[in-house]
């Protein structure tokens, strides 16, 4: 339900409901008085600003994962690069992993700083048709820990949406933290209230310990009415650079992402092999597609970009 305040009680009828502030479930809710008075129904000027700012963004896609360490940010960065291989496609990448931002480093723009123009914050340009925004660009010390509570994180996410001059984009990929936290609830609420979101790509690795949390992520998407575009199984296999022999990195004790997708009726978008060259490029900020465009992993990312573009 898109009109439920983020700090509402569990069975909130919705701020625009005739029962808003009057239902039994409203008892004790911090918004009860506002809802009953009708004041909370007034348009949020910030959400109007988000709507206006994103009006020229054709597709908005969340990149999610149940666990950390599955390569979600690497998938987000390389999918953005794969989409941007076509110079006619304009791509933006928003990093809302507030406490652990990675995109500035992965995209080779870690030393850049955000500048403000008359139209708002200027995103960092990676190449002519690829831009990125992250809290990493706002920190004086790149090693500085971000120790924030939820409300402050939510405010920054809203600021990234309403104050960054995103311009005209074909795709805005949103790299989120692992799990389902304040950042996820906020970004979903802001995007749905301000317009729409195309859906989510969920990244996992083959082993059951990762798939367990992916099932929770799928449940989160279904409860928040976010379309699940599909699952990406990262580090699905290892291709030996010497003999091209394919082997498994992780045990598929329960059949991996493929079996889970069949069970839950969710699309399987890609099985991405592990490539140590990609890990090195992520650390150095080099463009993996420029250096290893004929690799098996690059070709899988190209297929993934084509699927997303359909």
Curated annotation (Swiss-Prot):
Molecular-function GO term, any one: iron-sulfur cluster binding
Binding site for ATP: 66-73
Positions bound to [4Fe-4S] cluster 2: 240, 243
Binding site for [4Fe-4S] cluster 1: 12, 26, 29, 35
GO biological process: iron-sulfur cluster assembly; regulation of non-motile cilium assembly
Superkingdom, natural source: Eukaryota
Required co-factors: [4Fe-4S] cluster
Keyword ATP-binding applies: yes
The keyword Iron-sulfur belongs to this UniProt entry's keyword annotation: yes
Cofactor note: Binds 4 [4Fe-4S] clusters per heterotetramer. Contains two stable clusters in the N-termini of NUBP1 and two labile, bridging clusters between subunits of the NUBP1-NUBP2 heterotetramer.
Record-linked Pfam families: ParA
Keywords for the protein's UniProt record, in alphabetical order: 4Fe-4S, ATP-binding, Cytoplasm, Iron, Iron-sulfur, Metal-binding, Nucleotide-binding
Subcellular location: Cytoplasm
Database matches in InterPro entries: AAA+_ATPase, Mrp-like_CS, Mrp/NBP35_ATP-bd, NUBP1/Nbp35, P-loop_NTPase, YlxH/NBP35
Any single GO CC term annotated in Swiss-Prot or TrEMBL for this entry: cytosol
Subunit description: Heterotetramer of 2 NUBP1 and 2 NUBP2 chains.
Purpose: Component of the cytosolic iron-sulfur (Fe/S) protein assembly (CIA) machinery. Required for maturation of extramitochondrial Fe-S proteins. The NUBP1-NUBP2 heterotetramer forms a Fe-S scaffold complex, mediating the de novo assembly of an Fe-S cluster and its transfer to target apoproteins.
Family to which the UniProt record says this protein belongs: Belongs to the Mrp/NBP35 ATP-binding proteins family. NUBP1/NBP35 subfamily.
Protein's name according to its UniProt entry: Cytosolic Fe-S cluster assembly factor NUBP1 homolog
Naturally occurring in which organism (per UniProt): Brugia malayi
